[in-house]
Amino acid sequence: MSVSRLFSNPKFVYPLVGATIGSIGLAYYSTQAQFYIANETGKTFTGGDQWIDLKLKKSEDLTHNTKHLTFELLNPDDVSGLITASMLMTKYVTPKGNNVIRPYTPVSDPDQKGTLDFVIKRYENGKMSNHIHNLKEGETLSFKGPVVKWKWEPNQFKSIALIGGGTGITPLYQLLREITSNPEDKTKVSLIYGNTSPEDVLIKDRIDDIAAKHKDQVKVTYFVDENKATKDWEGEVGFITKEFLEKELDKPSPDFKIFVCGPPGLYKAISGVKVSPTDQGEVEGALKDLGFSKEHVFKF
């Protein structure tokens, strides 16, 4: 089935064909997102407009097009200064003097000292993702932030659903990790994560580890393209249908929140796209058909 045909059918949420965090998230850099100002010492990022150069400590291939990159913070005893759910802006200057700026969400713990970790997928026409993949250990990249999209508070909701695809997993993983790392936070979490193939499932080991340790609190469902599933694949195959979501999700309620992050096709089919960086837009797609509205859904 062709990509155009897949994305033209509003009944389904499609496994990821390819989208950068930049393509789904440049809208992060907006007046809707606020730069989080933290005055405490011991944090590399405290908000504001100052770009900070961090040295690449380690670059490790995870798949043919995905790297795990570790950057050194300004001081070995520093934490990043990020909170859940927030991200950083990255910048590099082209040989012609043009700035390329994209947002990325770290996968490291907020209290991790000395380093900052990212999982970044390379795309053929992705200027920043190609630049980052070409960085050599010891070279630097400019960062600033953090930019907070949703400030999580323990037990904000009785339950949440995290629906994402591809690189859209990063802010959803932040929420999953934050909730399960706090014994006082009893929020139940359902993660529904779609990708093209099993090899494309990012940070699966981390997600599976959390799910195994919190079986009564966390449920994870993976989807991959039907033509890409291997014989030993234990997740779901094909599309994430409205019928699946109807069985999996709680009914619309003030105690239940859905967070969505992925490429444009996923937004269109699941939740509707954002009107602008400052406007979440109306809920469309499968979630609208299931009775959800703006107060129930947040689009990263």
Curated annotation (Swiss-Prot):
> Keywords of this protein's UniProt record, alphabetized?
FAD, Flavoprotein, Membrane, Mitochondrion, Mitochondrion outer membrane, NAD, Oxidoreductase, Transmembrane, Transmembrane helix
Function as written in the Swiss-Prot or TrEMBL entry: May mediate the reduction of outer membrane cytochrome b5.
A single GO BP term for this record reads: ergosterol biosynthetic process
What cofactor does this chain's UniProt record say it requires? FAD
The name under which this protein is listed is NADH-cytochrome b5 reductase 2
Q: Which Pfam families match?
A: FAD_binding_6, NAD_binding_1
Per the record, the gene is: MCR1
Which compartment or compartments is the protein found in?
A: Mitochondrion outer membrane
A single cellular component GO annotation: mitochondrial outer membrane
Organism, as annotated: Lodderomyces elongisporus (strain ATCC 11503 / CBS 2605 / JCM 1781 / NBRC 1676 / NRRL YB-4239)
